[in-house]
């Protein structure tokens, strides 16, 4: 392992007072996560950055014989569900092709994200017809199933999954991420057992979760459900997954896929040096994601502390010649158990391909990590304020 990787490992181990994991657990994790070693091959800088970026681009999720390789920066398609601007179907599919052509070939969606699954079906057919087989082999479509609290019969689960398969025009879903609203209803175990059977029939390649807490993840694994990942909210502001959840994931091999990593765009230059207390003085919080994550900022420490964080991130970004969102994503990708982080895409309206691809070659050093953690340590512990992962969706 080269000097950069060693210094980064030492930084995280020496800064444990800023992180929830124990010294031993965190250091074990860093030793086991080979990606730390990738950027340290410094004998030929230009070649090395390209090699590091290529090797750091994809991650294998697995549980037993179930495997799925994804791009570590995922294209989140919540923004197709309304509230972010009108989506033109043709423009959206062209944008998806652009992302895939530039190596950003994993798309995350849900059954309730408006036309997201339908757009993926059109997109994947374009890939089949117009792109080489090598690109098709790297494209991944991850969807979610968020059922109502009804009895989870085999026929109901199977019919629901068939809807997504038809919309996405695939014989087997690459990944089905399951969400459940009410833990007092144990039907989630029935649903997951039926999903496991459907996986055995070849209708699903991998089973995963979204917004499950640590206790329920443990129960699910104890029931023999082959979960490969749990999708949770995780950002520099919201470090809850690095408490109980990451420790269980490290023990079991389950990975984390994170969303809210750039906080709907709040973690960007656009909101640097702005004062939202003055009406119309700053950028409008005019999307569901901006409004959601502004509430998270308020719970964490308020706008003044958030501005201090943005200024610190801007200093780090300038040092490396990247943007604030790139730093924000890289920081979370380097956390234990994190396999991939999501950036929401406004297909056909704006794009972030350059910033997203810059994540793969960015290496945060000891000084960067220390400066960021000195600010975040001033914020409230959101585990105490909100609860464990996903608890924000289950409180009255």
Predicted regions and their residues:
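Active-site mouth loops of central-metabolism enzymes
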Residues: 78-90, 145-156, 180-186
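Beta/alpha (TIM)-barrel catalytic core signal, keyed to glycine-rich beta->alpha loops juxtaposed to Asp/Glu
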Residues: 57-60, 181-383, 391-396
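A structural motif
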Residues: 101-104, 170-173, 204, 227, ...
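Short, acidic/polar
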Residues: 86-100, 152-169, 190, 213-219
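N-terminal binding-site loop/beta-alpha segment at the start of enzyme catalytic domains
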Residues: 2-139
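Active-site groove signature of glycoside hydrolases
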Residues: 165-187
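A short, structured active-site edge motif that brings together acidic residues
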Residues: 135-149, 176-178
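Short beta-strand segments at enzyme active-site cores
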Residues: 106-111, 173-177, 208-209, 326-328
